[in-house]
């Protein structure tokens, strides 16, 4: 990747405008922010034909340039997908206000009261893949949580992104929220210079390749939220219901293989490997999945041999690595060695084994008897997500509204001074009050 350039005067001016708008947005009340989102949704709906046409232009150009089928699938924004995205904006508008929530209320002394309340982060800098519905998701979450946003999408989606941003700003213009709260970056140089906007941007959220995320983490002083890989695993335990295991594994891989929560490695307990693979191999073959396995799984019918590189690969396509393991402990060891702490699943009817798996695997999501494709902010009831974080510190997993706020301590007194408590003239009471 290129070296990070200094921000241009024009970028500094635009970022400053977003910052100023974000201050006002953070003080907007719940109703004003809800109304702003409804106006954004209305503007998108009114311009739906133009948005789909802009996306078709991006699709045609990208197909002629040889963009991979998996990336073309992400790039596509047809009428149905757009309708779903618009519905998502309205759902975010209806979510409970994340701001002004008090989770601590304490009397430190008579007339000296402390509270901790949620407030916006400020300005988000979001760099995302060629997926134009991401612009809609991120913008809606930013406005609902009181944050401004600088957004940079993949160049493959430039026509769609520009048309979507124009619609979103038109919606905001008819609301109490300034259109300046959102800005679209359009060049590679701007996305690189974004990394030097500390003081104007409070959090960077990268969504894209491992290389992109690593580069951003290594080249900015701004906090970064995101994940570098989505190497997800499904483990078929000795006590698995094999029909259930085939169904869950198939969905986890094929429901949307380009997603970061699709499985890339299938681990199978040795005692059920023959019976499970005899059913799973034809099912995956019929779904167009290429299987690559270790020696034990190849001996049981997996058609291609895997190398160690396969255990580290996020295919984002219809390819799946398969490995036979001796037991749950061996499966857990493999996941710890090669996983990215995104999402893992165990299929078993043994409750104790499930509990061991759920408590021993340090991933953002650990599942029992269900598809890894549920690792999604919308499916969790968050309305939408800005991304998935695999970091240990919060927010972790799918990041929705709750992950886009911080908190502020407010202390109200009446001439209280610390010297009185240091001398013993006054004493703290530290009485918790009702929230």
UniProtKB/Swiss-Prot annotation:
Its main location: cytoplasm. This is Gamma-glutamyl phosphate reductase. One of its GO terms (molecular function) is NADP binding. Keywords: Amino-acid biosynthesis, Cytoplasm, NADP, Oxidoreductase, Proline biosynthesis. The keyword Amino-acid biosynthesis applies. It is an enzyme of class 1 (oxidoreductase). Belongs to the gamma-glutamyl phosphate reductase family. HAMAP family: ProA. Catalyzes the NADPH-dependent reduction of L-glutamate 5-phosphate into L-glutamate 5-semialdehyde and phosphate. The product spontaneously undergoes cyclization to form 1-pyrroline-5-carboxylate. It catalyses: L-glutamate 5-semialdehyde + phosphate + NADP(+) = L-glutamyl 5-phosphate + NADPH + H(+). One of its GO terms (cellular component) is cytoplasm. GO terms for biological process: L-proline biosynthetic process. The lineage of its organism: Bacteria, Bacillati, Cyanobacteriota, Cyanophyceae, Synechococcales. It is found in: Cytoplasm. Its EC number is 1.2.1.41. Pathway: Amino-acid biosynthesis; L-proline biosynthesis; L-glutamate 5-semialdehyde from L-glutamate: step 2/2. InterPro entries: Ald_DH/histidinol_DH (IPR016161), Ald_DH_C (IPR016163), Ald_DH_N (IPR016162), Aldehyde_DH_dom (IPR015590), G-glutamylP_reductase_CS (IPR020593), Glu-5-SA_DH (IPR012134), GPR_dom (IPR000965). Gene3D superfamilies: Aldehyde Dehydrogenase, Chain A, domain 1, Aldehyde Dehydrogenase, Chain A, domain 2.
């Amino acid at each position: 990747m290129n070296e990070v350039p200094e921000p241009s005067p024009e970028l500094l001016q635009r970022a400053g405008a977003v910052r100023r708008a974000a201050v006002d947005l953070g003080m907007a009340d719940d109703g004003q922010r809800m109304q702003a989102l409804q106006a954004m949704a209305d503007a998108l709906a009114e311009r739906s034909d133009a948005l789909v046409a802009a996306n078709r232009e991006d699709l045609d150009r990208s197909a002629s340039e040889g963009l991979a089928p998996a990336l073309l699938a992400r790039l596509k924004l047809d009428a149905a997908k757009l309708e779903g995205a618009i519905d998502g904006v309205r759902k975010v508008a209806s979510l409970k206000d994340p701001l002004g929530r008090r989770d601590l209320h304490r009397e430190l002394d008579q007339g000296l009261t402390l509270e901790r309340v949620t407030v916006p982060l400020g300005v988000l800098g979001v760099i995302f893949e060629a997926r134009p519905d991401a612009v809609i998701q991120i913008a809606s979450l930013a406005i609902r949580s009181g944050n401004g946003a600088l957004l940079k999408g993949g160049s493959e989606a430039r026509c769609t992104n520009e048309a979507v941003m124009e619609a979103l700003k038109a919606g905001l213009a008819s609301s109490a929220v300034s259109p300046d709260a959102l800005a679209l970056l359009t060049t590679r140089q701007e996305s690189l210079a974004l990394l030097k906007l500390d003081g104007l941007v409070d959090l960077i959220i990268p969504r894209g390749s491992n290389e992109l995320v690593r580069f951003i983490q290594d080249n900015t002083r701004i906090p970064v939220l995101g994940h570098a890989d989505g190497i997800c695993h499904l483990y078929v335990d000795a006590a698995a219901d094999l029909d259930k295991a085939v169904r869950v594994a198939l969905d986890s891989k094929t429901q949307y293989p380009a997603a970061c929560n699709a499985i890339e490695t299938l681990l199978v307990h040795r005692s059920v490997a023959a019976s499970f693979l005899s059913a799973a191999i034809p099912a995956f073959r019929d779904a167009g999945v290429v299987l690559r396995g270790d020696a034990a799984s190849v001996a049981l019918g997996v058609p291609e041999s895997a190398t160690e590189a396969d255990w580290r690969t996020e295919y984002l396509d219809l390819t799946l690595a398969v490995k036979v393991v001796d037991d749950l402990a061996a499966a857990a060891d493999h996941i710890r060695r090669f996983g990215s702490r995104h999402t893992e699943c165990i299929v078993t009817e043994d409750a104790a084994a499930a509990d061991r798996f759920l408590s021993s695997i340090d991933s953002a999501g650990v599942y029992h008897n269900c598809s890894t494709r549920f690792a999604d902010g919308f499916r969790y009831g968050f309305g939408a997500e800005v991304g998935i974080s695999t970091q240990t510190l919060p927010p972790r997993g799918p990041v929705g509204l709750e992950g886009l706020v911080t908190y502020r301590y407010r202390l109200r007194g009446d001439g209280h001074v610390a010297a009185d408590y240091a001398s013993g003239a006054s004493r703290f009471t530290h009485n918790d009050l009702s929230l």
